[in-house]
């Protein structure tokens, strides 16, 4: 719709902008329509629980309690530190990829928008195959070894990103990103699930995992912006994450491989 608005009867001034607005509506209709299946078949929670005023504060207290428990389990503590480090680079690269492509790639006239859309679609499509490939690698070599390998590949991608200037190079990089993006995210989560103790309160543990991931984004984006501000170069900022991924790989190497 955005790439070829005239095929959808969208004409006039700035048809691409109009098409983008319409696309938001169609996506909303898509989610509303297909979510009905879930709403219909999921069991209905009839029990109504009273909303407590201190629910947010209690959530923070629960996270602190989980952290105190996790600190006693050395292997999880080591893993979460490694995860925080490489996740800060991973999430930041994913967030700024489109902006990097817009600012740093020499797109032909009137092809920038289409090129960025194609790149995003390419990443999403290939991510499925990447997740399958990562699953096979983890079965053969173990989760930790596979995560170390993926961190090294990410570091190499960041080095390659420093030299990318042409659209074809950006497409190739996007394909590699898709290949390892879904895999490292899924494998990181499954590795954490293997490490947590047997408990009925797994939700709290994964809540802490998710909070760690969100905080890592803040750290990564702050680091990226700081380097970009000092050097005036987005490419130099990308190079910083080479070291972040390598540090993540080294921290993962400290974890005993048994059962992981």
Residue ranges and their predicted role:
Residues 30-41, 184, 236-260:
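Multi-pass alpha-helical transporter architecture, strongest
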Residues 43-80:
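Juxtamembrane intracellular "pre-TM" segments in multi-pass secondary transporters
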């Amino acid at each position: 719709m955005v790439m070829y608005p005239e095929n959808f009867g969208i004409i006039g001034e700035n048809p691409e902008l109009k098409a983008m607005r319409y696309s938001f509506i169609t996506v909303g209709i898509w989610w509303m329509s297909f979510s009905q299946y879930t709403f219909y078949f999921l069991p209905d929670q009839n029990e109504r629980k009273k909303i407590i005023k201190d629910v947010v504060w209690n959530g923070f207290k629960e996270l602190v309690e989980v952290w105190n428990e996790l600190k006693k389990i050395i292997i999880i503590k080591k893993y979460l530190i490694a995860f925080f480090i490489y996740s800060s680079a991973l999430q930041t690269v994913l967030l700024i990829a489109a902006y990097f492509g817009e600012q740093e790639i020499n797109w032909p006239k009137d092809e920038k928008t289409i090129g960025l859309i194609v790149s995003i679609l390419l990443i999403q499509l290939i991510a499925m195959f990447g997740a399958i490939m990562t699953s096979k690698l983890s079965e053969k070599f173990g989760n930790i070894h596979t995560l170390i390998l993926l961190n090294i590949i990410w570091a190499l991608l960041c080095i390659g990103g420093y030299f990318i200037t042409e659209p074809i190079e950006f497409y190739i990089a996007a394909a590699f990103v898709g290949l390892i993006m879904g895999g490292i995210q899924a494998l990181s989560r499954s590795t954490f699930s293997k490490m947590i103790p047997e408990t009925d309160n797994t939700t709290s543990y994964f809540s802490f995992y998710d909070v760690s991931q969100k905080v890592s984004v803040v750290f990564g984006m702050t680091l990226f912006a700081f380097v970009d501000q000092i050097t005036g170069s987005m490419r130099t900022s990308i190079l910083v994450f080479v070291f972040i991924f390598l540090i993540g790989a080294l921290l993962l190497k400290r974890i005993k491989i048994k059962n992981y």
